[in-house]
Structures are given as C-alpha cells and as structure tokens.
Amino acid sequence: MASYFDEHDCEPLNPEREARNNMLLELARRVRGAWSWAPGGRSLFNRMDFEDLGLVDWEHHLPPPAAKAVVESLPRTVISSAKADLKCPVCLLEFEAEETVIEMPCHHLFHSNCILPWLSKTNSCPLCRHELPTDDDSYEEHKKDKARRQQQQHRLENLHGAMYT
C-alpha cells in the first residue's frame, strides 16, 4: 500500500527548510533596506544583529548561560552525616557533614564553587544535561520550536501508523 504522500503526489512539510527560507528572505529584506539608505552603504549593515534574524543555529552552538534568577533560586542543601561520603561530580572531593551545597532540579548536588561558574557559561547540569531556563529569548524560542516540531513529527507518525492498522 502506498503512503499518503505517494497517493497525493506531495511531500511532507519540512519545517526546518521552511524556517531557513523565511530567515534568508528576511535577511535579504534587511540587507536591501540597510544598503538603500545607509551612508556609504556600510554602517547599518555592519550593525545588523544576526540573532535578531534568528540566524543563530542553536543545534551547532553552545547553549547560553542559565538565567541568573533561576541560579539564585536553586535550593541550598545541608549535607547530613549519612551523605558525607558523596562526592561533588565536578571536583571529585567528598562533601563534608553540615556543608551547604547546591541542588539542581535533577537532584544532583554540587559545591557552589564548582557549579556556579559552570552555570554562568551554560544552562545544563554537567552530569545529565537537564536544562535550566535562560535569559536568551532566541534560545528559549528555539527550544519551543524544537518541541513543537517533535510533537508534529510524533502526530504525523501516529497518523501514518493509524492508516495501516
């Protein structure tokens, strides 16, 4: 039996391709506008922010730092004597009894001197990559778009599977 797309002589939507085409069109519009009234034809073009255009490919770049408010609100936990044999996964030193450590939402424990510099560079747990929110709007939008694409793909697979059952 032929697939839905074969029967209707069409191809499935490719959201990444469509988004890339839209970004390139927007870039062309901005370049054309910047060159048309920029003195000397260069100053506005040099100041264009490619992040504003959504041209940053987050799949191939490091994620931004965790949001400062989120990092400040991470719970501080006092190590009990029963947990004193646990080690910080970053520095590999054992926690001391009654020491205050930072607990990530994934429940991994870290010395504050170990995890805070890490979270100032990236937004995830160094062990399991559980992501914290960021202050970067374009990255947060990328995460939402990625989740929507995954949901759409899942619905399409379910629909396709339902056609043959």
From Swiss-Prot:
Auto-ubiquitinated as part of the enzymatic reaction. Pathway: Protein modification; protein ubiquitination. A zinc finger (RING-type) spans 88-129. Its EC number is 2.3.2.27. Signal peptide: none annotated. It comes from the Eukaryota. GO terms for molecular function: ubiquitin protein ligase activity; zinc ion binding. InterPro entries: Znf_RING, Znf_RING/FYVE/PHD. GO terms for biological process: protein ubiquitination. The modification Phosphothreonine is found at T165. PROSITE patterns: ZF_RING_2 (PS50089). SMART domains: RING (SM00184). Residues 136-165 are annotated as: Disordered. It catalyses: S-ubiquitinyl-[E2 ubiquitin-conjugating enzyme]-L-cysteine + [acceptor protein]-L-lysine = [E2 ubiquitin-conjugating enzyme]-L-cysteine + N(6)-ubiquitinyl-[acceptor protein]-L-lysine. Keywords: Metal-binding, Phosphoprotein, Transferase, Ubl conjugation, Ubl conjugation pathway, Zinc, Zinc-finger. Belongs to the RNF181 family. This is E3 ubiquitin-protein ligase RNF181. It comes from Mus musculus. The lineage of its organism: Eukaryota, Metazoa, Chordata, Craniata, Vertebrata. The gene is Rnf181.
